[in-house]
UniProtKB/Swiss-Prot annotation:
This is Elongation factor G 2. One of its GO terms (biological process) is ribosome disassembly. It holds the Pfam family EFG_III. The gene is fusA2. Keywords: Cytoplasm, Elongation factor, GTP-binding, Nucleotide-binding, Protein biosynthesis. GTP binds at residues 14-21, 78-82, 132-135. Residues 5-280 form the tr-type G domain.
Length: 695
């Protein structure tokens, strides 16, 4: 049985182009998992195994790989850096115990780095920092360290210092051991020598070593007192303090190097062993009540002897069949075991289990707490489902995914492609919870919903290449919403007599704007039995059912509070269905009186531009109804942060590249809903009516 203290479940995350996938490749090379190094530049990278990833040079799915370093087992997950795929980062962070944040030595803290860092903070994941690409023109390790402090509000603990700059970067100094690691120009990671620290760096190394020890001993009162009295702790004592501080997120051990040139990577791997936590050292996953989603107060203790508790965190369909990636928190799992899916109440037999290496695999007979593995051919499991021992039912804390903000209508070019498309989309929805599909009841069109243009582009591409479904794609549509601005007190009676028993339900109610992000809330203050209590849920159901189709343009309605305060019933003719119909009629009657208003999604946009184009970029964002929030001067350009309506951002990447001669970058994520200006609202409503008229 494997020793859990020697497990490290880690993720590698960063901004697009910070060198994340290359860093992972180097880890695999150094740990003996691959023999020829794949480069993202030439589309041969091991972790980027989808066609779309190899072509675009970005990582879309989180590939999981197992490798070994100094008798420790690493389960490594390479996460995407593009903002449209942050759901993959979020999903990975859910099952990781530690991570490596990769930053570009010249680009520094870029927009997506911030988003991923925030997610990792929320998940309380311990991290190392690796400042990569120090061989690049304009790379500056110390500037990036300052940016980490200023932009991320984090505390980087410098563990290595660079020897040389840009194309003269030859190696690193280990601040703790006072050793210089110098590589030759062969590009081979093993071709290095350990030397004396260069004379011109001795003072700098001592300065950083003192700062490092001061930060470390703050984790141990006795050591701190001894250090203040002039007694230097041993290297092992310092390491123990750094390990504790890293685990508690007090600081982030920070390394430097060049993954592409194979310089500095061994020290990062040693740091994973020395400072990142094992599965037994992180807060155990909370168990929740499946009905309410509230924590029960119990946890999934990380132990091989406890009953099985595992989380399905990713579904993937590949050339070998359907794969369900699971993180085992407690217990053991063997081939042939029967497990309970607590979300469906159904049991499944475990057939084949595999350990993944990007998209290759090793067959397993058994797995245990701490393992991240894939199970082949599970039937009814979705992302976020808990798999457990049938005799010890439990539910792990579920995953919550962001709502899609953009949609496109699609239909197969070939009339016979509908069934094929339906099967393919079904598989893709199971794989990616932020990708949703629905059918327009009036037009029969299939509507695909996602997190951004690139997200949906790639889905259409996968349908074409992987499943052979050619699509006609409509223009992107924005996920507008509706709300109300005024309170209304009203009454509605539903009455139907047609021989025999009829239908009767009378409700007196108030509708008013709810708190932001409250969705729909309902309460009854009826006294005296004018509307019997058993009919209150029917009234609530009637109102809530109508919230999906607002009165302005049929968009879902947000933040509405309904109070039922009186009404009337008939001893024979009243029923739950009569009161539900009354509530639906009341919605149609009163919502137009309540000042209905169209809401549009506002995106948090983060643009990086060379300084000489900043005026053009800001002018363009203003024309897009953007509100500029912040401007920051960096070493290589300017970062502009703005809130911009999603409807104004379609095709923005092309405009930005043209304005900045191809040097601009941007990321955006959903921020909030805001009232549409009246001229925009009128145009949107008119377009919806025109579209509906054609159906």
């Amino acid at each position: 049985m494997a020793d859990l203290s020697k497990y490290r479940n880690i993720g590698i995350f960063a901004h697009v182009d910070a060198g994340k996938t290359t860093t992972t490749e180097r880890i695999l090379k150094l740990t003996g998992k691959i023999h020829r190094l794949g480069e993202v530049h030439d589309g041969a990278s091991t972790m980027d195994f989808m066609d779309q990833e190899a072509e675009r040079g970005i990582t879309i799915q989180s590939a999981a790989t197992t490798c070994f370093w100094k008798d420790h087992r690493f389960n490594v997950i390479d996460t995407p850096g593009h903002v449209d795929f942050t759901v993959e980062v979020y999903r990975s962070l859910k099952v990781l115990d530690g991570g490596i944040g990769v930053f570009c030595g010249s680009g520094g803290v870029e927009p997506q780095s911030e988003t991923n860092w925030r997610y990792a903070n929320e998940s309380e994941v311990s991290r190392l920092i690796f400042v990569n690409k120090l061989d690049r023109m304009g790379a500056d390790f110390f500037r990036v360290v300052e940016q980490v402090k200023k932009v991320l509000g984090a505390n980087p603990l410098v563990m290595t210092l660079p020897i040389g700059r840009e194309d003269e970067f030859v190696g690193v100094v280990d601040v703790l051991t006072r050793q210089a690691f110098v590589w030759d120009d062969s590009g081979l990671p093993e071709n290095y020598e350990i030397k004396e620290i260069p004379a011109d760096m001795v003072d700098q190394v001592e300065e950083y070593r003192e700062m490092m020890i001061e930060s470390a001993v703050e984790q141990d009162d006795e050591l701190m007192m001894a250090y203040m009295e002039g007694e230097e702790p041993s290297i092992e004592q310092i390491k123990a303090c750094i390990r504790k501080g890293t685990r508690d997120l007090a600081f982030f051990p920070t390394y430097c190097g060049s993954a592409f040139k194979n310089k500095g990577m061994q020290l990062v791997l040693d740091a994973v062993v020395d400072y990142l936590p094992s599965p037994t050292e992180v807060e155990p996953q909370p168990l929740t009540n499946p009905e309410t989603g509230e924590p029960t107060g119990e946890v999934a203790t990380v132990s091989v002897d406890a009953p099985l508790k595992a989380l399905a965190f990713k579904i993937m369909d590949d050339r070998f069949g359907a794969l369900t990636f699971i993180r085992i928190y407690s217990g053991r799992l063997k081939k042939g075991d029967t497990v309970l899916n607590s979300a469906t109440g159904k049991t499944e037999r475990i057939g084949r289990m595999v350990e993944m290496h990007a998209n290759d695999r090793n067959e397993l007979e058994a797995a245990q707490a701490g393992d991240i593995i894939a199970v082949v051919g599970m039937k009814n499991v979705q992302t976020g489902h808990t798999l457990c021992d049938p005799k010890h039912e439990c539910t792990l804390e579920p995953m919550i995914f962001p709502e899609p903000v953009i949609s496109i209508a699609v239909k197969p070019k070939d009339k016979n492609g509908s069934e094929k498309m339906g099967i393919a989309i079904g598989k893709m929805v199971a794989e990616d919870p932020s990708f949703q599909v629905e059918t327009d009841e009036d037009s029969g069109e299939t509507i695909l919903k996602g997190m951004g243009e690139l997200h949906l582009d790639i889905k259409v591409d996968i349908l074409k290449r992987t499943y052979g479904v050619e699509l006609e794609v409509g223009a992107p549509q924005v996920a507008y919403r509706e709300t109300i601005t005024k309170a209304v007190e009203d009454s509605y009676t539903h009455k139907k007599q047609s021989g025999g028993s009829g239908q009767f339900g009378k409700i007196d109610y108030r509708i008013k704007p709810g708190e932001p992000n409250s969705g729909f809330t309902f309460k009854s203050t009826v006294v005296g039995g004018n509307v019997p209590k058993e009919f209150w849920p029917a009234v609530e159901k009637g109102f809530e059912g109508m919230m999906q189709n607002g009165v302005l343009a049929g968009f879902p309605t947000l933040d509405v509070e309904v109070e039922l305060f009186d009404g009337g019933f008939h001893a024979v003719d009243s029923s739950a269905i009569a009161f539900e119909i009354a509530a639906k009629g009341a919605f149609r009657q009163s919502m137009p009186k309540a000042g209905p208003q169209l809401l549009e999604p506002i995106m948090k946009v983060d643009v990086f531009t060379p300084e000489d184009h900043v005026g053009d970029v800001i002018g363009d964002l203003n024309r897009r109804r953007g509100m500029i929030k912040n401007q920051e001067m960096g070493a290589t350009g300017v970062r502009v942060k703005a809130d911009v309506p999603l409807s104004e951002m379609f095709g923005y990447i092309g405009t930005l590249r043209t304005m900045t001669s191809g040097r601009g970058q941007f990321s955006m994520e959903f921020s909030h809903y805001s009232a549409c200006p009246s001229n925009v609202a009128e145009q949107v409503i008119a377009e919806v009516k025109e579209r509906n008229a054609k159906k």
